[in-house]
Amino acid sequence: MISRTNTFQHIESYFSRRFLELADGNVVAYREVQPEKSNRVCVIIHGLTGTSYSMLLLADAYRKKGFQTIVVDLPGHGGSTPIPVEDMSSLARWLHVVLQEICPNHRLALLLGDSFGASVVLAYAQRYALLPTTSIILAAPIPLIHPVLSIADRFFSRVPDTIARQIYYTNHFLLSVRIRFLLAQWRRPDYRYYVAECIAIEGAQANHRYAEMVLMPANMRSNPFLSPLSEQLASQTVIMYGDTDRVAGLRAARYLRKWGNSAHIVQVPQCGHLIHIEGISDIIDASVSKQNH
């Protein structure tokens, strides 16, 4: 059993846990912190197998920069209600409604999507006009699904939630393998412990079958990274990925450089797929630079 670190407990104490009920009756869970005299809002969308909890280290870095920071739980994650999702436009509409509720005064300065969350953010940005002053960060995106990941997804989509949790979240041997796969700097004990803690905390909240059988297939059916990046959107976007991202792979990195050639592209050194842990300082630097541009 992984005990919670003082670091996470301390950071979590800054954030209020909130639940928003939408007009259709669905609930959206999110974490929020609002520093004094803050007039910039940063909204973060997490990845497929995580929740808002795993984004706390990154969210706290934005808090320290004076951002009102909101980390939203995707449908079926954390405390958010699962919703019917036909394709990524369904999630784009969902995010549009959520942002109208949590950012009613259009003060959104920064919208960041991590991993699968990057696909959600991109799908939203392609369909809804953002203010020119809003910056978009696509962190550790997965523009192309590696064949090995496709096989793994098909396998896990057929596994019951209880068994999937044992395999994916609580098996100690596989936990070690997963950490080495996700992190470039896996020898760092603090990084290993952070990842292990997130996996342990979030495993109990995982709606595995919904993620693998609803959300992932929706992304495969209507991958937003297959659509050209408009000139306006490119001017607002920073694409960031780790140089040792084994989840997306080198093929995805080459695709991103070609697809987003007019956007600001940052390859983070000594960083794997968990850029929200290993690449926090790089993300903050890119965000501040984009805001000041």
What are these regions (language model features)?
Residues 1-42, 64-67, 292-293:
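Alpha/beta-hydrolase fold catalytic core
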Residues 32-79:
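Conserved HGGG/HGGXW glycine-rich cap/lid loop of the alpha/beta-hydrolase fold
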Residues 244-248, 273:
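Acidic catalytic loop of the alpha/beta-hydrolase fold
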Residues 147, 169-231:
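Conserved alpha/beta-hydrolase catalytic His-Asp/Glu region
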Residues 233, 239-241:
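Short beta-strand/loop motif that positions the catalytic acidic residue
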Residues 126, 136-167:
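Flexible "cap/lid" loop of the alpha/beta hydrolase fold
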